[in-house]
UniProtKB/Swiss-Prot annotation:
SUPFAM superfamilies: L9 N-domain-like. The lineage of its organism: Viruses, Riboviria, Pararnavirae, Artverviricota, Revtraviricetes. Residues 111-128 have a biased composition (Basic and acidic residues). The inclusion bodies are the site of viral DNA synthesis, virion assembly and accumulation in the infected cell. Keywords: Host cytoplasm, Translation regulation. Gene3D superfamilies: Ribonuclease H1, N-terminal domain (3.40.970.10). It comes from Carnation etched ring virus. The keyword GTP-binding does not apply. Enhances the translation of downstream ORFs on polycistronic mRNAs derived from carnation etched ring virus. The keyword DNA damage does not apply. Residues 102-128 are annotated as: Disordered. Pfam families: Cauli_VI. This is Transactivator/viroplasmin protein.
Length: 496
């Protein structure tokens, strides 16, 4: 019971304390200030300035320059005492608020609460500019999201296999980066603003060379020779071909996000199709194997950077002269033969007997014609390869005939290995027709496969004109006989 009474007394005391605090709060609010302090004591002997001369018509009491409160207080106090005391307090001058001359009577304006979000989110919120481009570097040692092309270019320059892409806003860039990192089970890519790449200290700023400074000369550096153009006769052995062949047969739908590739599957061969941000080295190896069907490059064409120079320059020429909008995407449709190897049936020599020929169409893309990849059986018997190569050669001849029948066509480039063309609203010229006919005459021969083929001879004889029958240059030579059968799986394991 004693503890109970003690608690009741404490509650009553706290209630009284609360009431007293409320009264004190009301008093502070009525006085117009929450601050406590002393003011200067009033000096009655100080001279009061006269009321300024009134220039407007009316009574003197209406003059806005007259001091009303202060003189009344001064007059009242002067009667009470003539000698000022330094110990007077605020209570003796209740007519004058202590914050009389302060704005809002000394009431402080409340400050807005600051946003305590992370610094990275603040940086991303502060860069929402619709006119600014963002660059996502997906992989490599400097992966991240950049808002300055100069910095992004340094992060991708001379780094093999790096993938990057430009976006119009931060949301698209962040979404694409997150999709990639989630598929790779990696860490979230960081946003790297251009400001972080500038000098961060005074010493660094002093040592940084201004861009507008006049140069008095250039130091001599040792020139590092770059790799020569791969051209259309690259080093390509049987092991590399079988690896690409098996890769295409084993590609599945779930690999699209990581490899940026899908396949068009046939009975014996799967043709690879590459979209933006795909690996340039993979595109090059598949191109040399003759197993590429479509390429959908980015606007910066970084996926094509390892392909032969004549192909890259032709694509750049098409973009410059045939497309007004530089942001439009394009496609490359490739039709080719497959490579053949010397003495294929008697030992499988790695040296290539004859490399693929190519027909490349360049056009404006209306979207990726995507179809999911399916895992296919990667077993081809030894005697089947000759038949497959002959069938692909005949399909190649048929594709040339289709180009000849199309009158609205423009030839971009042509030599004895490749024909690059595009559709045109205008009819083809005589120069275009001559280029197609010359290319047809170069490839329409049994030497296309490096050995004699009765099937190709029969096809060319049927398609030859009446006045110009086809004459096989290798007719009468011995045809290579078939050897024992083998599978691609066995060959791949042997070469490894």
């Amino acid at each position: 019971m004693e503890r109970h009474e003690q608690i009741l007394k404490e509650i009553a005391f706290l209630e009284l304390r609360l009431q007293s605090l409320k009264l004190e709060l009301e008093f502070v609010r009525s006085s117009g200030s929450e601050q406590k302090g002393k003011i200067e004591p009033f000096r009655p002997n100080s001279e009061c300035s006269a009321t300024p001369m009134q220039t407007a018509i009316g009574k003197e009491s209406s003059n806005p320059l007259m001091a009303i409160s202060l003189p009344k207080a001064e007059k009242k106090h002067s009667k009470a005492s003539e000698v000022p005391s330094p110990h007077k307090t605020v209570k003796e001058f209740s007519e004058i608020p202590k914050d009389f001359l302060r704005p809002n009577q000394g009431i402080q304006i409340p400050k807005k609460n600051e946003d305590h979000s992370s610094s990275s989110s603040k940086e991303e919120k502060g860069i929402q500019n619709p006119k600014k481009d963002f660059y996502v570097v997906y992989n490599g040692p400097y992966a991240g999201i950049y808002d300055h092309w100069g910095t992004a270019k340094k992060a991708t320059n001379k780094i093999p296999g790096v993938s990057y892409k430009k976006f119009k806003d931060m949301l698209s860039a962040r979404t694409s980066a997150d999709i990639y990192t989630n598929a790779q089970f990696g860490e979230k890519l960081k946003y790297i603003p251009g400001a972080t790449t500038s000098p961060k200290s005074f010493a660094e700023a002093l040592t940084t060379r201004p861009s507008n400074m006049k140069s008095l000369g250039k130091p001599k550096f040792i020139k590092i020779e770059e790799d020569d153009d791969v051209g259309f006769n690259p080093e390509f052995d049987l092991k590399s071909f079988l690896y690409i062949y098996k890769y295409g047969r084993n590609l599945e739908e779930e690999h699209f996000l990581t490899d940026r590739a899908f396949t068009i599957d046939k009975k014996e061969i799967s043709y690879l199709n590459f979209v933006n941000n795909s690996d340039p080295e993979g595109i090059l190896e598949s191109f040399k194997a003759g197993l590429v069907r479509f390429i959908y490059p980015s606007t910066n064409l970084q996926e094509l950077r390892l392909l032969p120079k004549v192909l890259k320059s032709s694509v750049q020429r098409f973009r410059k002269k045939c497309i007004k909008d530089s942001e439009k995407e394009i496609f490359l449709k490739i039709k080719s033969t497959i490579p053949c190897w010397e003495d294929y049936y008697n030992g499988l020599d790695d040296s290539v007997s004859y490399r693929p020929n190519y027909l490349v169409q360049i056009g404006i893309s209306k979207g990726v014609n995507y179809q999911p990849s399916q895992k296919m059986e990667a077993v081809v018997l030894k005697e089947q390869w000759q038949g497959i190569a002959e069938e692909k050669a005949i399909e190649f001849f048929q594709a040339i005939e289709d180009i000849l029948s199309n009158e609205k066509i423009f030839i971009i480039y042509c030599d004895d290995r490749i024909l690059i063309y595009s559709s045109s609203p205008k009819e083809r010229t005589k120069e275009d027709l001559m280029a197609i006919l010359n290319f047809q005459s170069e490839v329409s021969s049994c030497k296309l496969l490096g050995f004699h083929s009765d099937k190709i001879c029969s096809y060319l004889n049927k398609k030859a004109s009446v006045g110009k029958p086809y004459s096989c240059p290798q007719k009468g030579k011995a045809v290579i006989t078939s050897g024992p059968s083998f599978s691609v799986e066995d060959t791949l394991s042997d070469t490894e």
